[in-house]
Amino acid sequence: GFESITGTKDACKLDQELTSTGGVIEAVAGNPNAIGYASLSAVEGKDTVKAVTVGGVACTEATVLDGSYAIQRPFVLVTKTGETLSPAAQAFFDYATSSTASQLIKAAGAVPVAK
């Protein structure tokens, strides 16, 4: 996690646990000593918070996709092991990983999923 990547395990103090991206952005914007987790799309274009550069690598779509930005987590689609997807679920998975969906996801400011 964050603490192991940054080497700050013993220095971090959990002060507040938030359950929404908007709450994290608001809390970090209001506290100059705060650090929070948020999706890149939630941070881009904001003048109140910024993504942290890690090891000289800025957080961009390109560095997320190529894996060079160290503090990231994938968004994954999951199903129950051993179960065959229903036609509707398979259609959703096919669409979510299609080039059409990728374009929509990019337009929304997020990094598209891969198959």
What are these model-predicted stretches?
Residues 1-115:
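Exported/periplasmic ABC-transporter solute-binding proteins
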